[in-house]
């Protein structure tokens, strides 16, 4: 027995076809509105490591592990953060990622990668509950007391991250890491369209992160160590 799929039939009248096309266009516009808002929210506060203002904290978002090591995208983010530290544009690196399972620890893998590239261990602070971008931004502000930070992520994500952190109360500047326009990049860009809708709701309603917890003094202690 052959399965017949339903066919999409356009209206026969010219007016009906015009309304159908207008409806599709309206849906496309609505789908793009959150992503457009994210870019406008970031404004001119996104650039390269050379453009980034000097400050105290650089914040790196997790981007997955392969066999316990940072994925290439995460490694590139960490390379940019290490460059900001070496050039004196940051005194402390806040690594924020997922450690919801014992066998999966993004922050510790990020810390190891940075120390292997010359960033002192006492200048690295770990947030083990950065389960998504909004959680990372809110926790940086409320748990770690970060008021101003340079954020590092890929170009397709950095506008959303910057807008969310600004909505969370952080004076944020985003550094976008360039990547080849391969399948992974296009997948990330497409994923951003879906993630932007969720992010717009988060910025509007400002929910608590999945895990808030008590305040931590890691960033303040690392900055004090840097000033000695």
Locations of regions flagged by a protein language model:
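A structural signal for short, hydrophobic/glycine-enriched beta-strand patches
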Residues: 2-6, 37-190
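Residue-level signal for alpha-helical transmembrane segments in multi-pass membrane proteins
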Residues: 31-37, 59, 198-205
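A general structural signal for short secondary-structure boundary/capping elements
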Residues: 101-106, 173, 195-202, 219-224
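A transmembrane-helix-recognition feature enriched in membrane-embedded lipid enzymes
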Residues: 189-211
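Short linear elements at protein peripheries
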Residues: 207-228
């Amino acid at each position: 027995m052959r399965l017949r799929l339903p066919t999409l039939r356009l209206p026969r009248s010219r007016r009906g076809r015009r309304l159908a096309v207008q409806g599709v266009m309206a849906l496309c516009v609505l789908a793009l509105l959150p992503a457009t808002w994210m870019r406008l929210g970031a404004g001119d506060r996104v650039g390269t490591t050379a453009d980034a203002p000097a400050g105290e904290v650089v914040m790196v978002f997790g981007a997955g592990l392969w066999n316990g090591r940072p994925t290439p995208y995460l490694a590139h983010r960490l390379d940019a953060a290490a460059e900001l530290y070496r050039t004196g544009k940051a005194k402390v690196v806040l690594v924020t990622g997922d450690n919801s399972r014992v066998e999966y620890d993004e922050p510790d893998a990020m810390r190891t990668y940075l120390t292997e590239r010359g960033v002192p261990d006492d200048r690295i602070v770990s947030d083990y509950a950065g389960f998504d971008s909004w959680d990372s931004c809110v926790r940086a502000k409320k748990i770690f007391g970060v008021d101003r930070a340079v954020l590092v992520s890929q170009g397709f994500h950095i506008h959303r991250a910057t807008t969310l952190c600004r909505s969370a109360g952080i004076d944020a500047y985003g550094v976008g890491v360039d990547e080849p326009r391969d399948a992974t990049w296009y997948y990330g860009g497409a994923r951003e369209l879906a993630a932007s809708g969720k992010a717009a709701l988060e910025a509007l309603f400002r929910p608590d992160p999945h895990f808030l917890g008590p305040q931590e003094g890691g960033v303040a202690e690392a900055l004090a160590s840097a000033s000695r």
